[in-house]
Amino acid sequence: MNAQLSALQQQAQQLSESVTRPIPGSRKIHVPGSRPDLQVPMREIALTRTPTLFGGEENAPVTVYDTSGPYTDPEVRIDLSAGLPALRRGWVEERGDTERLEGLSSSFGRDREHDPKLDAVRFPARSLPRRARAGANVTQMHYARRGIITPEMEFVAIRENQRLEAIRDAGLLQQHPGEAFGASIQKIITPEFVRDEIARGRAVLPNNINHPESEPMIIGRNFLTKINANIGNSAVSSGIAEEVEKLVWAIRWGGDTVMDLSTGKHIHETREWIIRNSPVAIGTVPIYQALEKVDGRAEALTWEIFRDTLIEQAEQGVDYFTIHAGVLLRYVPLTAKRVTGIVSRGGSIMAKWCLAHHKENFLYTHFEDICEIMKAYDVTFSLGDGLRPGCIADANDAAQFGELETLGELTKIAWKHDVQTMIEGPGHVPMQLIKENMDKQLRECGEAPFYTLGPLTTDIAPGYDHITSAIGAAMIGWFGTAMLCYVTPKEHLGLPNRQDVRDGIMAYRIAAHAADLAKGHPGAQVRDNALSKARFEFRWEDQFHLGLDPEKAKEFHDETLPKDAHKLAHFCSMCGPHFCSMKITQDVREYAESGMKERSEAFRAAGAEVYHQG
């Protein structure tokens, strides 16, 4: 057993070392808050001096949002078998409204805990979970509605601003006006604004009290657009060590949250390893695991099995649950004439259960019971779109919009319990129908954050659906979607590997950033301006480092111009030394400046008179 456990830990440690090197040209910094234990991580990109030819000025570092946790900090020693430091434990405990349990509440969790066959894969550094005291509500929404600004709220306010107040270069602050479609975009994010947005339900701060390792992050259309990356093992592919690696890899490249969609062996144990080593919010779809417990027979599912699964996962520290409570019995026939029917796994499970029993969805009928569980651990609802369109032909149909209306009804119930709630959206939608989705969601769901899978704007590009969906994601992000669920090149084809995860995240970081630019989010253009200046001044290393993927940028440049001298060249391999448009522009500027100098000298030689008599 010890040998097996050691092998797993060693494998995970080796994997972590391959993905934890510092991001080129950057260093981890921590911006202090109002208390010593509130240190907000960011990434500072150092820039070189502008060459003398272009004025010879210093270029201040650029601060950017960072999701990578301690993994990219060379000063931190990573031990995956111990997990990350419990950053928020003191904040949770000092509120005095939770208690440490004497044992696990879930019967399934207790069975796994005492099964010796699982010793080889069990996370070794486990601690007992916390739960709200009797009668208490421990959600960030509950605190916000009572006028309390929590350390988590201050943390995200500092994080969202990205040290914008420290920028002194007016050129970097230059920005086109945005079109926010009614959003309340602020010039500076304050803790009070964060509190107010959470209290209104327009933003969520997913932070389970049993995930103290997480660095607080906010999701809402008045904040930076966030992205989610999916990972998870299946019955036929992928193991625990690989999933931990994918977690670290996903957050390295910019995943704001990660959903563990495991459906295969050791779901419970895999999730524990992931949560204990995750600085970002973790989401799940509990119905997947509940289905495993009944050997994949949807009709055998019961409320009791599902309830036990919710408690099991809440006590592990899952931050948000996708719950398909809007798939109602009366909506199922509306999908019969669709081209692709019901494509959501969770949606199809609940539809099958409804038809098998000819009863209403038990997630819907027990929704208030679910709320009681959510508010005892501060788990955020992600109300699932189980009837989302699976092709553009099915977009915006009666089934999809009927479910959306029900999700609006459920949102109001969740808010009655002060449970944080976001709404999941499509799917496959052609570009001309995207805004209708956003407008209807805002109207039906009271501006609760929208969380969309793309949408994919065409169905003809298997192998390239990270592109087809990033197009729709950029658009719907501009219109108001708060978080975008990434799509990888393997969508519809297979389980993504590490490179697929990277490609999907990059496509979605581009989409999210484009949306922030279009909305006019303050400071969104700073990085663009800094990179453009570096590009014009042929500061190649700065160009690489300011990019979303510095390693890829350098790799592509060095394929054709690999020598160190080429990092100082005033051209690239695209146009060569004689046809570089930026070099030509600089030559024109120099010519114009020299011409102006000659005219100035002639003016002074003529007596410096404005007018001359003929």
From Swiss-Prot:
EC identifiers of the protein: 4.1.99.17
GO CC, one annotated term: cytosol
InterPro entries: ThiC, ThiC-associated_dom, ThiC/Bza_core_dom, ThiC/BzaA/B
Signal sequence region: none
Low complexity biased stretches: 1-16
Residues involved in Zn(2+) binding: 428, 492
Free-text comment on the cofactor: Binds 1 [4Fe-4S] cluster per subunit. The cluster is coordinated with 3 cysteines and an exchangeable S-adenosyl-L-methionine.
Binding site for [4Fe-4S] cluster: 572, 575, 580
Pathway(s): Cofactor biosynthesis; thiamine diphosphate biosynthesis
Domain of life, source organism: Bacteria
Binding partners and assembly: Homodimer.
Name by which UniProt lists this protein: Phosphomethylpyrimidine synthase
